[in-house]
């Protein structure tokens, strides 16, 4: 193969990620031409509604997947947290890159951390998972929907529309935005459990042997283990992007895996959570086993109520 086309969204972060992967692929495959095919997705076009109201994060993938299936691209680079657990026929999750910081981060021009926020401070997030957990920590805060790409969200913060906003730490790091806002507070895993796959890039590809050979060098073993656990947990719960679920698996220095999971109602009034240390052995099934424990505690019913809450909002 002489040329590989990457389907990508046109946002600043998406282009950074795709160009980052392009550079690695060209370094690993001398002589390979790599080109970007920039596509505007439904999620990019609809900016005036909450994601949970219009179909969730999958709206950022649909057109990219169609481009691959129609032969207009061979791979797409995604923030793995945005990739549903079920792939369309003909496409596979071919590689998962080394993980950046998996945590969420609180950004503010005035307040250094969550505790410093005054009563009735306005916090912006489009994520039901973040909304649930911040409301559990601080029920006195006002949570408002925040859409747009990273620079749009930061502009809204700087213009005073919000006292603080919550973003993925990885995106801030990738775009070198640590100095763009006065306070950037990485939220600990104890305070807020991230989304499945957060911090890693997922390389979705056509199921073609030559393409898979080219992208194989992007694969990170630990990221695959961690995110397989996280994605299988969400898959077992049948939890799409429109329900509040957080799950994080981290391979520790001694080879064991630390796992945290949380789910509940968007207002934070009812939540199920658990954390445990386990071995890497049989990691493909760990997420499903933990999900089964959550289901025994009433997780499915709680998620159904969460969906109903959002539909009636």
Swiss-Prot record:
Its cofactor is dipyrromethane. Binds 1 dipyrromethane group covalently. It is an enzyme of class 2 (transferase). Gene3D superfamilies: Periplasmic binding protein-like II, Porphobilinogen deaminase, C-terminal domain. GO terms for molecular function: hydroxymethylbilane synthase activity. Pfam families: Porphobil_deam, Porphobil_deamC. One of its GO terms (biological process) is protoporphyrinogen IX biosynthetic process. SUPFAM superfamilies: Periplasmic binding protein-like II, Porphobilinogen deaminase (hydroxymethylbilane synthase), C-terminal domain. The porphobilinogen subunits are added to the dipyrromethane group. Belongs to the HMBS family. Tetrapolymerization of the monopyrrole PBG into the hydroxymethylbilane pre-uroporphyrinogen in several discrete steps. This is Porphobilinogen deaminase. It comes from Sulfurimonas denitrificans (strain ATCC 33889 / DSM 1251).
